[in-house]
């Protein structure tokens, strides 16, 4: 995207051997996310997304100009503005990436786009504590049990119930991080009948017990090796 047409960014000249002369402006930034044991969006995104300038994307260039201005001048409320604008540009980038995915794509983003699997994901995300079965999920979206099981596994790489179990741990980790609820209360909120069952599932996914996870997150220490979901 030709941001050089719009931005007066701080300049650093880099000499690159070339037979052609050209100017380019690089605007660098960082957008972080909370540490979670299971983040399907981040795991699915490629290391590099190349999004070209398109008609109707003028607002992105305007946002980039404002981002640079806020970064330079450190005005009141600037940090909050940078956070919101960065989030909006990230959402737009992910949306455009999903829209450009080939029909044969596989993975969480492809599942999100699918009219059946996407609705199943939304159901589980909205109510992770519900006693979902593949039969009930299929009934909600208009697919048979076998058809949903096959379609979900083909796109996501897991069965619906495997995904639900991992998503419950994701939600539980957020509750442990952001609330003072006991482990037993968190277990109940995400659909586990007992603290022991939740603790076992949590440790299997993260390598840490819920209590240890909470202590290490609170202290800023490493929480160990997170196991990639397969």
Model-derived segments and their meaning:
Residues 21-25, 39, 47-55, 223-224:
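A short, N-terminal "cap"/entry segment at the start of jelly-roll beta-barrel domains
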Residues 42-68:
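A short, charged helix-loop
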């Amino acid at each position: 995207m030709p941001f050089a047409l719009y931005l007066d960014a701080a300049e650093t000249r880099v000499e690159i051997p070339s037979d052609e002369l050209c100017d380019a402006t690089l605007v660098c930034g960082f957008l972080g996310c909370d540490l979670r044991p299971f983040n399907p969006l981040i795991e699915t995104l490629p290391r590099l997304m190349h999004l070209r300038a398109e008609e109707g994307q003028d607002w992105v260039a305007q946002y980039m100009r404002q981002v640079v201005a806020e970064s330079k001048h450190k005005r009141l409320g600037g940090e909050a503005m940078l956070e919101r604008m960065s989030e909006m540009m990230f959402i737009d980038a992910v949306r455009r990436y999903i829209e450009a995915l080939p029909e044969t794509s596989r993975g969480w983003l492809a599942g999100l786009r699918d009219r059946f699997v996407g609705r199943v994901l939304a159901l589980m995300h909205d109510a992770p504590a519900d006693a979902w079965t593949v039969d009930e999920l299929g009934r909600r979206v208009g697919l048979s049990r076998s058809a949903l099981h096959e379609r979900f596994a083909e796109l996501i790489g897991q069965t619906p119930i495997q995904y639900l179990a991992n998503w419950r741990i994701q939600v539980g980790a957020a509750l442990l991080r952001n609330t003072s609820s006991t482990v037993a209360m968190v277990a109940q909120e995400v659909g586990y009948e007992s603290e022991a069952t939740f603790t076992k599932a949590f440790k299997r996914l993260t390598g840490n017990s819920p209590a240890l996870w909470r202590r290490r997150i609170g202290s800023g220490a490493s929480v160990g090796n997170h196991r990639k979901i397969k």
